[in-house]
Amino acid sequence: MPDFKIVISDPQSVEPKRIKVKVKANDQIKSIAGEKEGKAVPQAKVNEKTKQLLNIDTLITLEITKQEGDKKVKVKSHFKVEVDNNVPDNEVWISKTMAEKFGAEDFEAIAYRTKTLQISIDQDKATNLVGLKIGDTFEANQLIGLPVKLKITGGSDNSGFPMRFDVTGAAKRKILLSGPPGFYPNEDGERRRKTIRGNTISQEIVQINTIIVR
């Protein structure tokens, strides 16, 4: 079975400040099982000054551009932030496992407050979410190790059919739509009959979209 995906957006990270930082692999940062494959949120340490400079709440994104053959490729990862004032200004410490993803243990990167990230979890863990509806909230700490509350805003099933907030239940239905999700009209007033899922998470749902609520 495919992994269950949780897409997390931070509504307060609209135009995040971007700064150049020094990134170092540090033995103090322990690797977390699955962090390199996107199945866990890895840890990063910064000092309080850098955290305030970037207006970071919980998550930081590190991004580099590297040459691969004749192409330039962007590599980025998202991290859960922990404050440690032993870390120098404008420096970020990460695990050696995550440093491997960037191809170096000491490098420069662009850092900014995370806008969106995606985490994959095993389907058996996702059963804890079955029965929740669009608009419901849940604590993410136990599920993905992130100390935030998440609000469900949508999702899709294993065939790609989207959940609709205004359709009760979990069943697949074919209804007349005039707008998203499920249909994007080309003309004003255009309507089309489309297959969608109801607003309740079932075993057939493979992705949910969420926002951080405070």
UniProtKB/Swiss-Prot annotation:
This is Small ribosomal subunit protein eS6. The gene is rps6e. It comes from the Archaea. One of its GO terms (cellular component) is ribosome. SMART domains: Ribosomal_S6e (SM01405). One of its GO terms (molecular function) is structural constituent of ribosome. Pfam families: Ribosomal_S6e. InterPro entries: Ribosomal_eS6 (IPR001377), Ribosomal_eS6_arc (IPR020924), Ribosomal_eS6_CS (IPR018282). Belongs to the eukaryotic ribosomal protein eS6 family. GO terms for biological process: translation. Keywords: Ribonucleoprotein, Ribosomal protein.
